[in-house]
């Protein structure tokens, strides 16, 4: 039998994506100014980034990056266990652990490899199992597959389903893993109830709080703290640095023994270059601002409420989210693509989320809010969405194949 030709396979997949009108396109950003983006020569007001606190362009953050780059250079030049672990890395780990109330922290290049590192290092036997919410981020799900352990999934937010899945796999070590804030829906996992399930089933509870830390909870400490939980209930927690903190990278916080084990055995940590010290210095400045500036979170709360009130008054279908992620359900993907295009014509950049990222018939506009938005910009967006809906409803839409 002839070996499959990879180029032929890729060509067939490309033709299918074109026929389905599902080709993914990268939009090139020329410049940024706060929440404004220059794309294709036009300035648009962005409601699509994860810069929830508006820290990515804050002058203290930029100054910290510039100063560290002048002192330490452009890169770490080695892995953490050779000579790439700088004072900046150590300080950032210590301050994030202290902020979140955890004994230890370990810095990773990004959240995807951090999730892989955790599962590969802890679930090393084929009888081990990772039980996950069906809507968890792809990095959590892919990490289980790559770790080689068993993956069992439960219906979204279904605590009893999580219990059933853990009971159904009693042989090996177990981890219960969940997003804290779900990135496409904006809702929050029932962390207290899940922590009880994990304890009853002798499973380690691991929470990915990529979208919560900095935004939710007391002093922005995230969903785990907001639920009144800590290291005793959630022994490991993922914090990403590229969303509310405006930079790049990820940190896993946890108890001393688990974090030490990751540092000594996690291949994605050991066999890669450490983050540039300048980037780490910028993130450290952002962490200090996030802890200090409660006004950023207060403004976000006001903007979220204003958006939801305005959208509800105009009859839009909202999802159960009190976070900066505010999806508007549009149904068919042809509708959401037309809505997104109409909004761009009106001067707004809003992400259109469609299958396979979300289920068929659940395409949506994914509006994300930042503390840098003004009430006037939020109202202008609502007005533009209403106009886009009216225009799109009168147009024949191209159906995907």
Curated annotation (Swiss-Prot):
GO terms for biological process: biotin biosynthetic process. Pfam families: Aminotran_1_2. PROSITE patterns: AA_TRANSFER_CLASS_2. InterPro entries: Aminotransferase_I/II_large, AON_synthase_class-II, AONS_Archaea/Proteobacteria, AONS_Proteobacteria, PyrdxlP-dep_Trfase, PyrdxlP-dep_Trfase_major, PyrdxlP-dep_Trfase_small. Its cofactor is pyridoxal 5'-phosphate. Homodimer. This is 8-amino-7-oxononanoate synthase. It comes from Xanthomonas oryzae pv. oryzae (strain KACC10331 / KXO85). The lineage of its organism: Bacteria, Pseudomonadati, Pseudomonadota, Gammaproteobacteria, Lysobacterales.
